[in-house]
Amino acid sequence: MSASAVGSVPRQLTSYVFLLAARLVGIFILPAQVPGDPVGLIEELFTAPLATVRSWPSALVRQLLLQLVRLEKFTLPEDSQLVRLHTMRQRYLAAGWEATSVTTPDAVVLDALLRPPPAALAEPRFVLFVGGNFQKYEDWLPYFDAYARAAGVGFLAFNFRGVGRSEGAVCCAADMLTDVHACIDALLARGVRPAHLCVHGFSIGGAVSALALASRQQPGVAFVSDRSLRSLPHTIYGMVRGLPPSGALEAAAPRADDNGGGADDGEGVVMMHGRWVRPGLRAAALRRAECWVRGAAAAIAGAAVRALGWELPAEAGWAARIPGPKLVLYHRADNVVHYEAASLHLALKDAGDVGDVQEVEVRRLGHRGWGPHDFPLVADEVAWKALIARVRETLGVPDS
């Protein structure tokens, strides 16, 4: 074996270990890759991690570990969720949608569904929807169908690689950008002009779409950023650290007794560690300590995300310019993308970079169990009407 061949082995091993670590992070960033019910699984792992893992058959654990280390798609022998998604898909195929697929440059086949544009349009106009990290397009077909009908355009919905029936696995952020590029190229290959295409990116899909459009500099393609983030480390910080716990200051303040006086008479104090203290002060100290621990955890997680190439710096991508028309939807009470810490909208405003951007504030606080971040916009009448009007205007859809 030559010296160069010997030297390449450590490099290949290092590259593989890095890719495996990036894939592990990618599972947390895009949990829709997890087969079965990822939401239920995460809840079980948080509430009873050891009991949950012990309940898995050993053969299944071995299978999933092999798929992980081989950088393959996660699959289950019997996945009831795929059956449920197939049923939803069939319902909309019977209602005029078309089954299709998109093949990426690295030969990964993405599962997709397409609603043809109205025949009355002289030229096809399309919305490409890029979903969030828990999303499978099948679950959102009622919303997509309403979106396509209201806007009077065609619609393409797809699952990222490794999600649902799409092949492959997301091992790095570049994989997600590749998937978006492939979907854009597929629509352009169908004869859709760039000026007649709108990419709607929701949540993390908004960050991925922003970076994809900025890297291509595709003139004319419109972009909707829907409750999206400035970067993943900012989002992690907002979720893990958040604002100081509510009530911390009130707990630290001296408390009056029932007669309106102070607590100098010793009421409301207890002996702790050899001295008399107020329980409220101890609780406030614990809350402050929790804030520091959360802050440290957020900083460590953010550093790991950056080191493994998962930063998704949408704000920087935006600064590099997305040449087409742009619309930003945002929610000040977002329960996932913390507005002050992580919102793309606020970052653009602070940077003075909203001059050519249309802005729509989402105000509804939730819908049918969804929080402010997740609910379909059709549930917010004002934001919905604004979105549809701007999409129709931008794509040049004639009034019916």
Regions found by a protein language model. Give the residues of each.
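Short, surface-exposed "cap/lid" segments of acyl-processing enzymes
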Residues: 109-111, 115-150
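Conserved alpha/beta-hydrolase
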Residues: 148-167
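Active-site nucleophile loop of the alpha/beta-hydrolase fold
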Residues: 224-235
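Short beta-strand/loop motif that positions the catalytic acidic residue
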Residues: 321-323, 328-330, 334
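C-terminal catalytic histidine-bearing segment of alpha/beta-hydrolase fold enzymes
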Residues: 336, 340, 352-400
